Amino acid sequence: MAPKHDGFKDFVLDQFSGLPCLTHRAMFGGYGLYCGSVFFGIVHKGRLYFKANETTARRYRERKMKPYRPNATQILHSYYEVPVDILEDAGELTLWAQQASSL
């Protein structure tokens, strides 16, 4: 069976042209984002999530962003949805990705 085309994933990858270490792999019905061997992001159901710690998660919560929910019963508080304004600004998105990949 041919893989399903994912326009959102393609958009996200295009936005990361300033991050040469970026690779991605299909996983859990979405895609995992890596910088080298470091797993730092998730593309799932038309949303982008970055790895966060206690300090950086505050920045996401202040913008009313939610943690990653792979299903109705599970919440991963170590990954938060990236705000749309950041997603649309390739330079800012790269900075946020670099921070997420350094955690």
Task: Kindly label every feature range from the protein language model.
Residues 1-103:
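Charge-dense, helix-prone N-terminal extensions
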